[in-house]
Regions:
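Periplasmic-binding protein-like
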Residues: 153-160, 279-303
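Early extracytoplasmic/lumenal segment of secretory-pathway proteins
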Residues: 18-88, 341
Length: 341
């Protein structure tokens, strides 16, 4: 009878996909460097008792590490700030599909990977900010207009090696084609207020210091500046206003990108990982994101923070986000050809 019961339990375990090899932890390879992530993982640990371990590096390094580790990789999840990197990892065969009705119900359908290999947790817009003293909103219109010579010596932006700019250029390439984006990029270079340097915060600080009049930045950085404990950063944030480009009736909308997770092909803690992703896309966790990182929620039930709401709603470029990876190499070639350092 004892052996019979053991046999029955073994069959049930197979039928219901019991995984006796899963440990009480999750291992994440993360490109994200935000304090809110630590808070989210701590909240999850308290709720479930599942330990979250994080290794941080840039996205390409982490993807290469996953490739080299193969079936022996300890990683369960890969998280990055760029849909293009998620698409790259999927093309490399490093991920498996994420199957969860709860996640699919939580996340806006327009943001989720149509192939099922990655999910968004937040998104942001690549916006324009302009000097309150030297620029009027009526002077601004589109990304394309920034190449006009009227902006010569007035535009601030970070290096072409930055993933945010590469994603923007990829979206422009997909929407406009090679010839147009090469002309656009040349125009932007001619209009630089200075050689590209620093991060997005530094571009806003440069406007405040009178070194330029317009900057291309991620939307959440303005929220971070305005909520900073450093008065200099608050002052910089207050010196500019937010403008969402390409909002006209016949325009495509502003470029967005996501932060998102993929589950590794050989994830040793698959069920724990699904639990974490279900939590991170829940209303509770999404509210934590928007009120701490000033990103937009991937869950449409969650409103932006009060600061972000004050900028108003905007039309989103509905380009398939996987194309941010598809056109990445072409975007980099455009930067190189046009001298965008």
């Amino acid at each position: 009878m004892k052996n019979y019961l053991i046999s029955i339990l073994s069959v049930l375990c197979i039928v219901y996909s019991c995984d006796t090899n899963e440990s009480n932890e999750i291992n994440i390879y993360s490109q994200r460097h935000y304090e809110v992530d630590k808070k989210q993982y701590e909240n999850f640990e308290q709720k479930t008792g599942i330990k979250v371990n994080v290794i941080k590096a840039n996205a390409d390094e982490l993807l290469e590490r996953l490739k080299n580790e193969g079936a022996n990789s300890p990683a369960d999840l890969f998280v990055t700030v760029d849909a293009g990197k998620l698409q790259k990892g999927a093309e490399m065969g490093l991920f498996q599909k994420i199957n969860s009705d709860e996640i699919n119900n939580n996340v806006s359908k327009e943001l989720i990977d149509k192939n099922g290999y990655w999910i968004p947790i937040t998104y942001r817009a690549r916006i324009l900010v302009y000097s309150n003293d030297r620029v009027m909103a009526s002077e601004l219109s589109t990304y394309e207009d920034l190449a006009d010579e009227k902006w010569k010596g007035r535009i601030l932006v970070r290096s072409s090696s930055n993933a945010y700019n590469q994603a923007l250029m990829s979206s422009l390439y997909a929407n406009l084609g090679q010839e147009t984006v090469e002309k656009w990029s040349s125009g932007i270079v001619n209009n630089f207020a200075r050689d590209p340097k620093g991060n997005d915060r530094d571009q806003v600080k440069a406007i405040a210091a009178g070194q330029g009049d317009i900057a291309i930045v991620n939307s959440y950085y303005i929220g971070l500046l305005l909520s900073s404990e450093k008065q200099q950063e608050v002052d910089a944030g207050n010196s500019v206003s937010v403008f969402f480009p390409n909002q006209g009736e016949n325009e495509r909308g502003s470029h967005i990108n996501i932060s998102g997770f993929a589950m590794t092909k050989n994830a040793p803690n698959k069920q724990n990982s699904i639990k974490l992703l279900e939590y991170l896309t829940s209303v509770e966790a999404q509210e934590t994101y928007v009120n701490n990182s000033y990103e937009y929620a991937a869950n449409s039930l969650v409103m932006p923070s009060e600061i972000v709401q004050s900028w108003g709603e905007f039309k989103i470029d509905e380009l398939d986000l996987n194309k941010l990876g598809t056109y990445r190499n072409e975007a980099i070639k455009v930067f190189d050809k046009t001298g965008w350092k």
